[in-house]
Amino acid sequence: MRYRPVIGLEIHVQLSTKTKAFCSCPADVFELPPNTAICPVCTGQPGALPVPNEEMIRFAVKTALALNCKIHKYSRFDRKNYFYPDLPKGYQISQYFYPIATEGFLEIDGDEGRKKVRIRRLHLEEDAGKLVHEGDSITRASYSLVDMNRCGVPLIEIVTEPDISSPREARVFMEKLRSIVRYLGVSTGDMEKGALRCDANISVVDTETGRQSNRVEVKNMNSFRFVEKALEYEFERIVKAMERGEDVERETRGWDMTTKTTVSMRGKEEESDYRYFPEPDIPPVVLSDEYLEEVKKELPELPDEKAKRFMREYDLPEYDAKVLTSSKELAEFFEECVKVVNRPKDLSNWIMTEVLRELNERNIEITESKLTPQHFADLFKLMDEGKISIKIAKEIFPEVFETGKMPSQIVEERGLVQINDEKLIEELVKKAMEQNPKAVEDYKAGKKKAAGFFVGFVMRETKGKANPELTNKIVQKLLEGE
């Protein structure tokens, strides 16, 4: 490929602390009425002083450890100065000169195999407020309202090196990061609620000439799919400009989900535009060896480690292990099921197909469903005893998922118990053979697929309740014996 994208991400992770970064207002403000979770500190009233939230610092250290970062025992807060209606202080408290962590990495499944994406820095900062545009977008709004609830909500910003080589890799990185912060319990990682936000910097290299385009920042990507789509669009836009012998502006662009395009927002700021200087009202953050050791002990088993254990302990293929461990709750559900039904591969197959289908259709997590390990114990018992076929099991599963009823109850209510009566099945096969001598002749002439006709006949006559294995066996016996 002649043109190659060079992508780096700036990701904001909203921390699930009880209170805000520097005051005692609640941090979970997503569903609160506008301007009801504010105080003199987070709205920047004169004389109000910030007090750092210890839980925020602990969450940042946990995340940095999980991302293989170098933790700095000494870090400091700074003021990032800029004017915007949702920033009442006129500055944002961040960490610029001395971040809490640097030099990390995260391994992802890249386009050409396993790949390390380096992390330049991880630092703490507070969130700004939120503008609510009348008309849904800033370009089409007749006026905008300011909601200060989000002011002061704690964030960590994670900045990667430009190691990402495709829009797909950017999406995979984001998905992996969300999985990690959820495992750690430091964030919900819900992009649609703004708990995980991504800005991407993209430039394009012409591999034949070595020429590189200007860097463009892309914002407003509030889903993993939009991260990938926005970067695909921007890559194509830059390539077209380069093919015309032009260069793109160094600017910030926003993803418009309606038109599926990026639109110019403003010129790209330089870091000097923010006039960073040390925050005088907050002392430095000094971490002891004992504190770091204590936090390290709190780290849970992370997705990669859990996937390796699933492969080793349950003899699962790598693909199964990765799918099951992509969500902490799903992995826990699988292990609970294995305790009740010790058939890991069968359970894995059911969870990855039937369960995930139902979850995705409803856009819910496994913890929000009525499904329990006991449902699988009952379902597998029905199949093992020959009372239902796998076809019937899959047929009733949506009702099991929806209602929480036991499979055996549904089977009884709907009269779906499998027919294992050999005599009855034999009579039906004979009836089919009498009515369809041509199919019998075809079978004897070597067209073995003709046997399927007789199996289908029995299934239709019994409304799918005949034991398929037994039916197949009887069909073969009678046809061979003719």
Swiss-Prot record:
Name the Pfam families on file: GatB_N, GatB_Yqey
Give GO terms: molecular function aspect only: asparaginyl-tRNA synthase (glutamine-hydrolyzing) activity; ATP binding; glutaminyl-tRNA synthase (glutamine-hydrolyzing) activity
EC numbers, comma separated? 6.3.5.-
Origin: domain of life:
Bacteria
Signal peptide (UniProt feature, chain positions): none
> Which segments cross the bilayer?
none
Cross-referenced Gene3D superfamilies, in alphabetical order? 1.10.10.410, GatB domain, N-terminal subdomain (1.10.150.380)
Keyword ATP-binding on this protein?
yes
Q: Is-annotated flag, keyword S-adenosyl-L-methionine?
A: no
Q: Which GO biological process entries does UniProt record here?
A: glutaminyl-tRNAGln biosynthesis via transamidation; translation
Keywords assigned by UniProt?
ATP-binding, Ligase, Nucleotide-binding, Protein biosynthesis
Q: Which reaction does it catalyse?
A: L-glutamyl-tRNA(Gln) + L-glutamine + ATP + H2O = L-glutaminyl-tRNA(Gln) + L-glutamate + ADP + phosphate + H(+); L-aspartyl-tRNA(Asn) + L-glutamine + ATP + H2O = L-asparaginyl-tRNA(Asn) + L-glutamate + ADP + phosphate + 2 H(+)
Question: Which PANTHER family is this protein grouped with?
Answer: GLUTAMYL-TRNA GLN AMIDOTRANSFERASE SUBUNIT B MITOCHONDRIAL AND PROKARYOTIC PET112-RELATED (PTHR11659), GLUTAMYL-TRNA(GLN) AMIDOTRANSFERASE SUBUNIT B, MITOCHONDRIAL (PTHR11659:SF0)
Role played: Allows the formation of correctly charged Asn-tRNA(Asn) or Gln-tRNA(Gln) through the transamidation of misacylated Asp-tRNA(Asn) or Glu-tRNA(Gln) in organisms which lack either or both of asparaginyl-tRNA or glutaminyl-tRNA synthetases. The reaction takes place in the presence of glutamine and ATP through an activated phospho-Asp-tRNA(Asn) or phospho-Glu-tRNA(Gln).
Cross-referenced HAMAP family = GatB (MF_00121)
Under the subunit heading, UniProt states: Heterotrimer of A, B and C subunits.
Which family would the database say this protein is a member of? Answer: Belongs to the GatB/GatE family. GatB subfamily.
Q: What is this protein called?
A: Aspartyl/glutamyl-tRNA(Asn/Gln) amidotransferase subunit B
- The species is Thermotoga neapolitana (strain ATCC 49049 / DSM 4359 / NBRC 107923 / NS-E)
Q: Which gene encodes it?
A: gatB
